[in-house]
Amino acid sequence: MYLKIYIFRHGQTYYNKLHRFTGWKDSKLTPRGIQDAKKIANRLKNKKFEAAFQTRLSRSKDTLKYVLKNHPECKKIITDDRMIERSYGNLQGNSHKTIIKKFGKKQFDIWHRSYNTPSPKGESIKMVEKRVNLFIKDLIKFMKKNKVNVAISAHGNSMRPFRKYFEELTIKQMMQLENPYDNYFEYKIKV
């Protein structure tokens, strides 16, 4: 027997649209982001899951709300910030252009996409991976104990280590991933 995980990224936010470092700042879904959430909901409408996970950020919660409209069987919604977006620390709220202008493209790229280097007072992807792996360990226990399929409304950078784990990717492969706003990934857990 297999249990299923359906993981998806929240829809586009205003900070995403404006190319700002969002991180742990709360940025609402744009009209396109709402359409993204509806597309995910439509693509998942024939799947079954009894529990769903979200983070405390409205973009995760709001995307999940659209998905859950098709899933009356989902009785448990759990907020778990181990799947929250990467903290960009002092960069949060700043536009990419501003950071490039102030620190240069090379430093921007290091802070934006480096595995090992955190942004000032923020997290590296390596740090995000550590908390996501703890979440995965507990998630698998939860699923097996309760015999449930789950949906996870996540974030672009928390999905990277999640996908690395289930797709058995290298760090390099993980860092090249782009997670779409309007689709989901499905993984199986053997019980």
Q: Model-flagged regions — what are they?
A:
Residues 2, 61, 133-191:
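Active-site-adjacent alpha-helix immediately C-terminal to a catalytic or transition-state-stabilizing loop
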Residues 11, 58, 83-85, 114, ...:
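Short, solvent-exposed coil/turn elements at secondary-structure transition points
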Residues 55-57, 82, 113, 152-157:
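Short, well-ordered beta-to-alpha junction loops that form the rim of enzyme active sites
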Residues 2-12, 104-109:
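Short coil-to-beta-strand
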Residues 38-107, 166-169, 174-177:
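Phosphate-coordination/substrate-recognition cap region in phosphate-metabolizing enzymes
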Residues 6, 12-62, 119-133, 176:
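Loop-to-helix element that buttresses phosphate recognition and phosphoryl-transfer chemistry
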Residues 17-20, 105-119:
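Short, basic/glycine-rich phosphate-binding loops at helix/coil junctions
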